[in-house]
């Protein structure tokens, strides 16, 4: 199985980049079908649980989901506890075991949204003995014996056979199938189809297709020639299946295989479903490992590459399912993950989708080979694939083509209607010496190619005309007599994508470190293609949190008042240790498999949007990980900053705008490495800069993102980064980007915000910056409760806010009480609940965009402060409600920030604060129709609110406490020690 880990590059190249369903009928020629056993697919065994797995199937490469029978199961003659799926009691309902019709509709809608089709398992031959038709319809609707009892077939004691000699049966069956077509299904897999007359299938299939208004797919569980004549698109390859079992067991060989292959060649478009397992084989004959042993991969290759074949994956095969599913009972669900079996099937799907030569209708040429091997070539549309399979141990196999030299093409796909120019990075052995062009691609053409320092790269400029249509184009490469092509997909851009809105001062941003949040899928904690394994007890190890965990908490976050999520990087970080944080990226276009997949991330964004939560991606342009794939073969010598030995950045931001700076100091600031495991990228290289521009746009379009947070912003080359920001905003004018500028020097921080009148003329084009000075002021001010001198206590907050004169856009500052790099606010404030609530009160009401670190709302503290980052980045305490102090903090936070959602004065109102040197802070936020008053008492004693001091505000109004909703007279108001009050006019 080790060889499967070597397939990752091929998968990355060939994997589908579908952004939306295609409207044209693909003819099913390259479709991958997945048989979904709802009962056993998930621990819950429901449509809802299965729906959650659809993004994984899409990422796997599945095109068509075949749902095993989902109808109510008869009770009369029932086998086992739950019964056989194929003993149907009602054709127009769902089995309550699986869920409701509405649950099924949701499943179909989600599959269609992902670009997959759904077909139903249809059992037209028989019903259960207690189907209503048995007693409510004429007796002749069923075959009956001389005593009037319904007839069974084989050992199927739980069924009653229908009589298609009755017109009523035909009409009722057609009407039942219409019911499901109207609900959006895309076709039917017809059980035991040959037992139902041809003269039923022929008009029924034709009628359903005519009425559907879209292509419908019909698959027959049969192998009679008349199936195609009746209108079926494909039929089972039962004979072939039993043959490959025999070959694997040594009782048959090449001669029998060639004879069977000839029937595939002669099929002339009549497709055959090929499989190594299905529900019958798994439960009754055994798993593919039982039947085929070590030959299972080789036999799979035949299923996926022969002419006129359609490949099937049965539930659990992609997880290495090693047991026979119980047929009449609930069984253990497969252990989903990203192991070598998933990699194998992902590779097969990628080959099938990436090569027209592997379409069902592609040409076939058998080659000479030894007695224990079959070799053949498949050809279509200029594409050519060589397949070789050994028919005896050691069962070697290969799928090869000239295109195998291509390891990567990035971006992996693109969109119509974009402003950002497209330049493809093509990585492959010696590809720099090849020519590139698009053939027969109206509106899409190559305008230039550029060699790199390494011969294994080619940069290809692509022009996409305004009228270019979405679709899969072929990028052709040629060198002398040699040529090959690869697919490149151009997607239709979402309507309104360019006008997307972003995060603002009206939002509450919730910072999640995914590995330390919630583990929603323990099966992906480790992966065959990543190095570091999970170690939940290690401070700096991987704990297992993932995308599924974030998704599971969206309802909690919405209820909390969260309107935006910033998660620390989810992209692949395959360094040897401390990879949990994600800041040492090793692949810019793929989500780390221990978090999930690209499709799961996109689904998370969709789900978040349904909860009215925006999604902000944390991106790193300054450095990559030392195990990034390009580190073994850099495109250009100056792709990264190379030093004679490890040279750390001097971390001195002032070198970027110091009028007296020495050049060596400025260069070291920009070019020194951030860490020994994080090589510093050189954005002065124009190809790298263009790479990062496209990469950012790609993720915005692909995942439908709402914003970026840029890590270590001033460490980048500042002029290229200014250009990078400008290019993103040219594509998305209302998009927001916040940069990390970690300094307590207000003018130094202000220098990096777009529009700031810098004396050197520099404009970063960076819309938002993180307000580290204010965060420091929060911690220093609220942790001091002693006698107040000139610069102690809450005057620090006053002074910091007074420095807003330096900021070009004070409302577009990200303000926070802490983040993943700093001590938690409860730690900073001595675990004092009143002080933490005061911090949240200031966070909710001061200017800017509030951000809170995950779990701070439940009064989380570091596990071990001596462990630094590893100690503060605790796992989210899912049982927080059992802790009264955590629940009290949560309830306060929830009330505060849900109130903030609807408060225009806090979002955009004028700010007026009042200077006092008694360790209190008073502030008004003033909008046209409302005012908000905030008073924070940081003393260890009660304080009277000096309401008369605020007369200039015009305080004659009725005021209400925003937490309790009660009316308050602020002229006679005292605020308890280490507490606050927030009032609002109505």
Model-flagged regions — what are they?
Residues 401-433, 486, 490-495, 499:
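Beta-strand/beta-sandwich contexts
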Residues 16-66, 72, 105, 110-111, ...:
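Carbohydrate-interacting/catalytic domains
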Residues 20-48, 52-63, 69-183, 203-217, ...:
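Substrate-binding/active-site clefts of carbohydrate-active enzymes
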Residues 4-13:
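Sec-dependent N-terminal signal peptides
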Residues 33-35, 64-69, 119-120, 189, ...:
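Structural recognition of the beta-strand scaffold that forms the well-ordered cores
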Residues 418-480:
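Immunoglobulin-like IPT/TIG beta-sandwich domains and homologous Ig-like subdomains
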Residues 108, 175, 186, 191-275, ...:
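Active-site-proximal helices and loops of the catalytic beta/alpha 8
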Residues 268-290, 810-830:
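Active-site clefts of carbohydrate-active enzymes
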